[in-house]
Curated annotation (Swiss-Prot):
Its main location: membrane. Pfam families: YidD. This is Putative membrane protein insertion efficiency factor. SMART domains: Haemolytic.
């Protein structure tokens, strides 16, 4: 399932994104962030993180460096 979502984002990056001028306010870009978040946390949590990030990507937000949070494994 992860591969499908990451493939869709890669398709967007390859075929749709080049049609528009760069506008992401963040580093890494929102699409890079989404791919890394889904890869690290899975489809549900990774997509949720990506959606929250995309909602912050607007002209009134300063943007800047905003990496995917680290994965914290619980140790018993």
């Amino acid at each position: 399932m992860k591969g499908i979502f990451i493939g869709l984002i890669e398709g967007y990056r390859r075929f749709i994104s080049p049609l528009f001028p760069p506008s992401c306010r963040f580093q890494p870009t929102c699409s890079q962030y989404a791919m890394e978040a889904i890869d690290r946390f899975g489809v549900l949590r990774g997509s949720w993180l990506a959606i929250k990030r995309i909602l912050r990507c607007h002209p009134f937000h300063p943007g800047g460096y905003d990496p995917v949070p680290p994965c914290h494994h619980k140790h018993d």
